[in-house]
Curated annotation (Swiss-Prot):
It is found in: Cytoplasm; Nucleus. Its main location: cytoplasm. Keywords: Cytoplasm, Nucleus. GO terms for cellular component: cytosol; nucleus. InterPro entries: Ubiquitin-like_dom, Ubiquitin-like_domsf. This is Uncharacterized ubiquitin-like protein C800.12c. It comes from the Eukaryota. Residues 58-135 form the Ubiquitin-like domain.
């Protein structure tokens, strides 16, 4: 007998005689206090490495490749998206985030990805990015 058949037969049996079934609970034994009781979690001291949960930040320096050379820098969490990074850089450069293209080690950075996808924060504290400013009119 498969698990589905066992469950079906149990439900059929329960629907035929719900009051007499051994798994049924009499309605008078159910009250609102039984339903709304909160069970506190046990207090256990954390045994792991707290450094895993700390926010890791890197210093990002983005510099244009072509003249006129422009530069922007910020301290940012590696769990930030590339779009969030572009928004910070754009505010410093007085431009739109959509006009900024960033590259790291020859690879374009995708807006929806995390900075952590490209940079290892454990081994790097400063990241130098190539920046391209597009003329959007």
């Amino acid at each position: 007998m498969s698990e589905v058949q066992i469950v079906k037969s149990f439900l059929e049996e329960l629907s035929k005689t719900p009051r007499n079934h051994p798994d049924s609970i009499p309605i008078e034994k159910i009250d609102e206090t039984a339903i709304s009781i909160t069970i506190p979690a046990p207090l256990v001291e954390f045994q792991g490495n707290l450094a895993l949960f700390e926010e890791k930040k890197v210093h990002v320096v983005a510099k244009t490749v072509r003249p006129p050379i422009q530069q922007a820098s910020t301290e940012i969490n590696v769990q930030s998206t590339i779009l969030e990074l572009k928004e910070v850089l754009a505010s410093q450069l007085s431009t739109q985030p959509s006009s900024i293209r960033l590259m790291y080690k020859g690879k374009p950075l995708v807006n929806s990805r995390l900075l952590d996808d490209y940079v290892d924060a454990d081994s790097v504290s400063e990241v130098n990015l190539q920046m391209f400013l597009m003329n959007i009119s």
